[in-house]
Amino acid sequence: MRSFFRVIDQIKQAVSTEPFNNQVTFGDIADVDLRKQSMFPLSHITVNNATITTNIVQHNMTVFFMDLVDVNNAEDESFFLGNDNTQDILNTQLALATRVIQLLRKGDLYRQEFEIEGDATCEPFTERFENRLAGWAVTFTINTKTDMTIC
């Protein structure tokens, strides 16, 4: 069964070809390199679970689209934008997430008989990691045909 590898490879390829991303990693979110040695902006793929049905396997995944927050020492007088680039990161990384999901819906993943089920859920984060990262956790389910037989 190679559908798992094909799914994560297609996600990696879709993310890697887009601007506003320098690196794609995979695994548990705790495995993300938070020592400022990674090349940000960064996307990280995690697998939440899989459901096996009669004819398909449903892969529930989250892709984290993130960048380092750059704090400006100038005093913030508006109290709206803040003295960092958090809003810029949320804007660019949501645009990246939207583009990647659309590519997966219409691109090679779709032509390889995979499909995203339903809509992707996007959750912003601004204080999830110790390295002042901000971005989006995008969760979605990809259905793949099972190529396993019981014979």
Locate the predicted segments by residue.
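Short, charged interaction patches at domain edges and termini
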Residues: 1-13, 53-58, 106-151
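Short, hydrophobic/π-rich interface segment
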Residues: 88-114
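Residues in well-ordered beta-strands of folded domains
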Residues: 46, 64, 139-141
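Small/polar-rich, solvent-exposed N-terminal microdomains that initiate assembly or binding
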Residues: 1-56, 103
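Short histidine-centered catalytic/ligand-binding loop motif
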Residues: 75-93
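Short acidic, glycine/tyrosine-flanked loop/strand segments centered on an H-E-D-like triad
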Residues: 62-81
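Short beta-strand segments enriched in hydrophobic/aromatic residues
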Residues: 49, 67, 142-144
